[in-house]
């Protein structure tokens, strides 16, 4: 009494010695049902009672708990009686249930009398197998508090230690889990952690699948407390407060173990082990195939494959995976890690590894001779005295002080002996089933067998079955085979065979191999005594003789792959003579992309290290660079990408000898024996000359640019170089050409690095294969043995499957039927359909319907909604893909062609008579023309079929079936001037009549009545008359981009009309002509016949094509073209082409000229308003164009553009030095002007005498651009004598000075931005910019060059200068003054007197008047104080008063040059 009950400090108390774990778990589970929980004292008393009970003869298996309860003494301490009572209630017995065990009473009460003893009380009843398992469900008393406690690591370790020796799903395994679940009450997450800690990923995946199934059934059935709105059961079970749902989830979690493979038998694919010499990729491929064939549907394959790829690998691969940390990584990482171990570059050797002989010295444990100390049976002596009791005869772990004191047992009802049996542990030999040979036995070592790429480990052995004489045979050594296989021919007489299921690389089979349970003796050449096997596999097809691991283990043979110590050597393939860089251009220098992500940089370094080890690259320090970067593939592996676009741009493209991939249907059925050869890393075997390394160099950067990068260059031909495929094809063709000559009856198909051999006999195929492999190996081309395939069976080549009489694609696309597609999705599915279209029985109209859905979309994320017609096309293509198949060529049968012309395209079929499948389906779109005759399409299709069949099959089609009627074809040949008429006449003897049915059972897939039905538009629309129709009216029509007009005439003009085209659209003359013809045909609709006269060759050709039957293609005028056939339907038409603008007096030319005049608009002269709106010229220019001074002033003042720009009407003026005649002195400057976010340089040159301007638009202000601008100004104005500029660097450069000297031009400089020295050119800059701003304000999209030319036209030739009344161009090109003879006096100029002021003086009084010597634009020459001097107009005033009628002109004369230059 007074014991404290609580949780046990350890998860699972240790079982008493001698009691099985399964029985102990039953006791513990019953104990944990007590409330309150049992204490350590209760477990100690239970262990004490069970130790005593184990010594009684009543202890049986299974235990009779009723009989065991009778052994409990009265007043036994603890709660042992309650635990046994729980077990009694739950035990199922065939007899009547035993009476409950009386509960121990207190000493104060009187116990009831004991029952009378029975003579058979100690004899247990006969055992009957219980109907239910002895496992209890998880049960908690009602109202008990939650016992949930998260796992700790010591708890998980204790549970894993308990289940480590039990099988998955066994009673011991399940009882341990139930006890742990009942004690800790875990949540769903805790159970998932426990499962991942105890089991492999394979078991976790299978358990997860079964648990989801049970949860779905439970949620459907309904559970107490389950709320579907609160989330799934797994989420609700994670809540510690949801005790009821958590217990339901715990029961489902335990029940999910009932269907795992460990409960009955491990699946066949779980026993696939990697052989000692088997490449890792081949082992993974066997696992993949086995899982595909044996895994239940819906089970995720990836985690199972990843788990088995590590656990079932050999020790060498497991060590490599552990070292790289890839024990549970993605499969791609594991394959890449073990790729270096693949025995493709190793020498395969078979050796016998005997046990070492025992030493001659005595064992230091027992002192005897003849064994190693590790095999000694004596226990290892302790190193010294025990640290606890100082006794040297035992270890510390065996010290008696560490053992609890043995309490004296209370007397039981029976006095039994205390001896107990001892259990001896089983000592297993090191190495499993391998038995070491006797020391006296001679050691046999197998001689080294070098294995090349084309050889297999084959030995000559002798096999004896059932004691018969040994028979010699050749056997294959295969470490991947679990059992030895012999052919049935070695078994004498009938024997009893057993069915068995064999799983290999090609899948499961239960017919070819049988199990032979008869002793078998195998005599090996390196072993004296035979290998004896109790059973083996029997090959009923007599193809295989294989020595498996069961025989190799007995002889202690080992296949291993020794490392090749030789360094990497470049394989002896010839160096190419030409690669396209013989002209040695400067190597490209492209900066490396930033790669600061640690993952990408690490992947790039790993890839470079592997390439460096393989000898594909080497350190480099020369010029040239192309960027590199890694790309992650879908399988998780990284791929090295070298961006060689810069190198490809300077490389000369070599002509490829390959015309493209071959059509595999051309393989004749007379070549049934096939074999494929796949080359690995083929490009990396072609050496690259040293002089080309700068073009293929790259840099590996340091992280965060902490240091200079590492430079490398390729030593072999890299991938990504545009001439690499061509060079490799040339090298491979040179290797295979001798084989083609040696075997003329065989065929060698070569495309890139894939090779297919086809021979008429198997013997010839073996010879061809051996010589081809030898030639490839000799030339240094590595061969992938894993991808080599050979008949019998299907051959996979270039994405297709080759069967004996037909060819299919490896995979056909799965088309989801939905109306909403993105542009990318639709493009991808159409690309997949295009790949398999040659074998899909579908018409072109279905494909064209889907292709048309792509029109108008550019954004890859754009959503496309399919129409009902396009959805129907998807259904039709999905049904046709189920019949995707093509036949192989039969050389004895001719080729036939079937052509179906339709408005959506042409469908062609190449087939042979009486064959099950056609050879090819070809879909051809219509040419991109607005109108194409049907006869031309037929001729083009015939040429396409002849080219295809001649290229792929070596012969032409014997005949063609087509859907063009004989009448339509004859009309086309008789009436059409098309060049294709000669082609059709040449092939007329190969045509069948319309609707003739081709032979072959595949025709039921075509719906031939629909396929060969003649299109309605193929028939002619109207009839052409060769002569003029006297009773029909005449129609004349013509059109322009603005108008369309027609005239209908019959002795008189019946009707004429002019139709304007919409002004907001862009039109062409063809559209106007087509619209005019349509309007005229509508007016002539009542007449059944019509004479049409046109001057448009386009319409004449178009109508001729419609008359002979043509296809209406896509065009910009498709809407108008579609309106023509209904208007012409059934009419008789005479067409006549008229030459325009001939001015001939005949009636046809006269009416044609009259029709043309209806659409011609008269040329209206430019008005002053239009001139100012076009050029924004000044008032005097408008007056010269006929406007009055008042109208000109009003136009300038009311112009919105002129008021917006330069509204002040003021420009800076200055005093400058002017020339005395044109091209005397120029002034130049460079001003900047911003146009559409770009700044341009305007080079401005002004003649100081006439004011003529030249402007050049340049992008820079260099000396070269300045010289170019001067030359352009000279071509416009003439060569100057003197130029004046500022002191800019372009004008002061040596190049510009040399230019001026060579052209004899004097150059001087002035102060920039000074009105007294550079005023003229600065003012001209402002005038030009103002005009440009005005033009661009009126028309923002006006090109800058056009605006500059318009400004020059306005300044030089339109604006009138004051007071000369001439334009700058007139002044600049005015004739020179006649020379004045020395003898004669010069003519006196008309007297012109001016008052003047001197510039720069503060005196405001007018002086003079003086008579002017000469006048120019902006100034007059006066003689002041005896010296001539130019005075600007603003400092001059006429001495004579102006006339009254010219007052208005004088008023505006002073400001016109300021307004507009």
Swiss-Prot record:
InterPro entries: Aspartic_peptidase_AS, D_retro_matrix, DNA/RNA_pol_sf, Gag_p24_C, Integrase_C_dom_sf_retrovir, Integrase_C_retrovir, Integrase_cat-core, Integrase_Zn-bd_dom_N. Residues 473-551 form the Peptidase A2 domain. Residues 1392-1441 bind DNA. Residues 612-802 form the Reverse transcriptase domain. GO terms for cellular component: viral nucleocapsid. The record marks 136-137, 350-351, 446-447, 571-572, 579-580, 1019-1020, 1166-1167 as: Cleavage. SMART domains: ZnF_C2HC. A motif (PTAP/PSAP motif) lies at residues 94-97, 130-133. Residues 1218-1387 form the Integrase catalytic domain. Residues 1029-1164 form the RNase H type-1 domain. The keyword Magnesium applies. A motif (PPXY motif) lies at residues 124-127. Mg(2+) 2 binds at residues 1038, 1073, 1095, 1156. One of its GO terms (biological process) is viral translational frameshifting. It catalyses: Endonucleolytic cleavage to 5'-phosphomonoester; DNA(n) + a 2'-deoxyribonucleoside 5'-triphosphate = DNA(n+1) + diphosphate. The active site is at 478 (for protease activity). Its cofactor is Mg(2+). Gag polyprotein: Late-budding domains (L domains) are short sequence motifs essential for viral particle release. They can occur individually or in close proximity within structural proteins. They interacts with sorting cellular proteins of the multivesicular body (MVB) pathway. Most of these proteins are class E vacuolar protein sorting factors belonging to ESCRT-I, ESCRT-II or ESCRT-III complexes. Matrix protein p19 contains two L domains: a PTAP/PSAP motif which interacts with the UEV domain of TSG101, and a PPXY motif which binds to the WW domains of the ubiquitin ligase NEDD4. The reverse transcriptase is an error-prone enzyme that lacks a proof-reading function. High mutations rate is a direct consequence of this characteristic. RT also displays frequent template switching leading to high recombination rate. Recombination mostly occurs between homologous regions of the two copackaged RNA genomes. If these two RNA molecules derive from different viral strains, reverse transcription will give rise to highly recombinated proviral DNAs. This is Gag-Pro-Pol polyprotein.
